[in-house]
Amino acid sequence: QVRPFLEVHERSACQARETLVSILQEYPDEISDIFRPSCVAVLRCSGCCTDESLKCTPVGKHTVDLQIMRVNPRTQSSKMEVMKFTEHTACECRPRRKQGEPDGPKEKPR
């Protein structure tokens, strides 16, 4: 069965969608412990923009608290704890920044 163009287009558009992220990528300084689960589902911006010069970018964010099990491999002890993760609430296609380009506007020479 062929999926209609409008559905294909809508599903591929820039939007916040459930994405699996590794806890160790979000908390790289916590490498000495093991987390269960090792990744969590959060909303993150992804999708296609109408032009290759644009990138799907978050324009709204909030923090969610998720309960995770932390295991200490040396002592084999475990505990439940709450960890904070960023979720994207709104997304827009914005111009891609070139490598080495400053974040702010460029000053004009005088």
Curated annotation (Swiss-Prot):
The modification Pyrrolidone carboxylic acid is found at Q1. Keywords: Disulfide bond, Growth factor, Pyrrolidone carboxylic acid, Secreted, Toxin. Disulfide bonds join C14-C56, C45-C91, C49-C93. The keyword Nucleus does not apply. It comes from the Eukaryota. Expressed by the venom gland. It is found in: Secreted. GO terms for biological process: induction of positive chemotaxis; positive regulation of angiogenesis; positive regulation of endothelial cell proliferation; positive regulation of mast cell chemotaxis; response to hypoxia; sprouting angiogenesis; vascular endothelial growth factor receptor signaling pathway; vascular endothelial growth factor signaling pathway. One of its GO terms (molecular function) is chemoattractant activity. GO terms for cellular component: extracellular space; membrane. Its main location: secreted. Belongs to the PDGF/VEGF growth factor family. Snake venom VEGF subfamily. Snake venom VEGFs that may contribute to venom dispersion and prey subjugation by inducing vascular permeability and hypotension. This protein induces an increase in capillary permeability after intradermal injection, as well as a drastic hypotensive effect after intravenous injection. The hypotension is mediated by nitric oxide (NO), which is produced by VEGF-activated endothelium NO synthase. Also induces angiogenesis in vitro, probably through VEGF receptor (KDR/VEGFR-2) signaling. Homodimer; disulfide-linked. Interacts with VEGF receptor-2 (KDR) with high affinity. Negative results: does not interact with VEGF receptor-1 (Flt-1), VEGF receptor-3 (FLT4), and neuropilin-1 (NRP1). This is Snake venom vascular endothelial growth factor toxin HF. It comes from Vipera aspis aspis.
